[in-house]
Amino acid sequence: MTASASSFSSSQGVQQPSIYSFSQITRSLFLSNGVAANDKLLLSSNRITAIVNASVEVVNVFFEGIQYIKVPVTDARDSRLYDFFDPIADLIHTIDMRQGRTLLHCMAGVSRSASLCLAYLMKYHSMSLLDAHTWTKSRRPIIRPNNGFWEQLINYEFKLFNNNTVRMINSPVGNIPDIYEKDLRMMISM
């Protein structure tokens, strides 16, 4: 991974990895589910200054002093999240440069928000898609972008680096990212 260690340090008081509430990805970027995104105590204790809601089904409670951004995308294979990769990555970066903190969330903090996080790490931390996924999964083990988002992330990685570190492969359950091939083989052999 090419990002500096300081940009990934945890703040004091944040335990990692956190599956059900906030997961700190970088010093200024967090992932969560929709319930945690509406928890005033969690937001204030983690000094969140911006919330990106990557869902159509979660309604945010608006708290003073927090900027809210809506990315109205469903968690479906044919949903177009790619168009939001650059604008949301740029926003997260701008907030970080101003010493702010961003919370990305969707319904469960598994697919849509995780995909936006991976795009940000590729663009602003020069991480390959594979490294971005490995890092983010180490911080939030439940991430699992849907296959349509994987295809879009693979295209985005190619746009950024003219190279791919993850590819879609054919499997008994359809096309999947090659990083899931080992897990699938283990499941099938059981």
Swiss-Prot record:
Domain spans labelled Tyrosine-protein phosphatase: 21-162
First and last residue of the signal peptide: none
Top-rank EC class of the record's enzyme: hydrolase
Gene: DUSP21
Protein known as: Dual specificity protein phosphatase 21
Biological process annotations from GO: flagellated sperm motility; peptidyl-tyrosine dephosphorylation
EC nos: 3.1.3.16, 3.1.3.48
Subcellular location: Cytoplasm; Nucleus; Mitochondrion inner membrane; Cytoplasm, Cytoskeleton, Flagellum axoneme
UniProt entry tagged with the keyword Cytoplasm: yes
Family per record: Belongs to the protein-tyrosine phosphatase family. Non-receptor class dual specificity subfamily.
Keyword terms, alphabetized: Cell projection, Cilium, Cytoplasm, Cytoskeleton, Flagellum, Hydrolase, Membrane, Mitochondrion, Mitochondrion inner membrane, Nucleus, Protein phosphatase
Domain of life: Eukaryota
Region: Sufficient for mitochondrial localization, residue numbers: 43-128
GO-annotated cellular components: axonemal A tubule inner sheath; cytoplasm; mitochondrial inner membrane; mitochondrial matrix; nucleus; sperm flagellum
Active site: 106 (phosphocysteine intermediate)
Protein's membrane topology: Peripheral membrane protein
